[in-house]
Structures are given as structure tokens and as C-alpha cells.
Amino acid sequence: MSPTPTTSTNASPARDEVRGVVPKLIDLSEKVLFGDVWERPGLSKRDRSLITVAALMAMYRPEQLKGHTERALANGVTKDEIGELITHLAFYSGWPSAMSAAKVVKQVFEGRKA
């Protein structure tokens, strides 16, 4: 049985950390990004997760990469696919981005074993 795709608008630790500073940004993230954009029918949540992980790796956004890697796994992206994504993008976004992403992803994978 495949996992139920997730785009939970529930508070995340990252969003909670800055909610008091940018409450409107968090509100827009939860209502528009996760409540609307992620719910559009044109792409599956799995595909959106794969695209988002790729974009975050390419833009060198390790803080956001962790949470979206967890979401991608919950949405059915496999560990092998994430590894292939990192390897493939190394040639387009650079070796440093790929190596940093690999470290973040390794932490996520290890956290799921516990």
C-alpha cells in the first residue's frame, strides 16, 4: 500500500520558529502554498515533492531541504530516487550543492531508521 500523500498545512517547526516575526508570510504559506498550490490537480503530490527537492537542492537551501525530503518520502518518492536526483543535479547545479544536499538527505534517512 502506498503512503497517503501529504501537504499538511499544520504548523511545522520551521514555520513556528518565525511565526511571530512574519505571521502573514506563514499564513500565506499555509493557505496559498500548501492549501492551494500543492492541491492543484496538474501534478501529483509525489511529483511536486520531487520537483521541490530538486529546486531546493539547486538553490542551495539546506534548511528547507530537510523538511521537504521528509515530505517527499511520505509522498512516495524513494530513497533511491532522491539519490539519483542529487547525482543528476550535481551536473546542473554544481558539486557543492549536491554534496551539501547529500549530507542533509543522509540525516533524514538516518532519522527515519530510528
Segments the model singles out, each with a brief description of its role:
Residues 77, 81:
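Winged helix-turn-helix DNA-binding recognition segment
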Residues 83-106:
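C-terminal structural segments of small proteins and small subunits
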Residues 55-61, 90-94:
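Short alpha-helix boundary/capping elements
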Residues 48-56, 85-86:
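Short, structured motif recognition centered on aromatic/hydrophobic residues
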Residues 65, 82:
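Aromatic/hydrophobic pocket-lining residues that form the small-molecule binding cavity
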Residues 1-46, 59, 66-74, 98-114:
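Acidic, glycine/proline-rich low-complexity segments that act as flexible tails and inter-domain linkers
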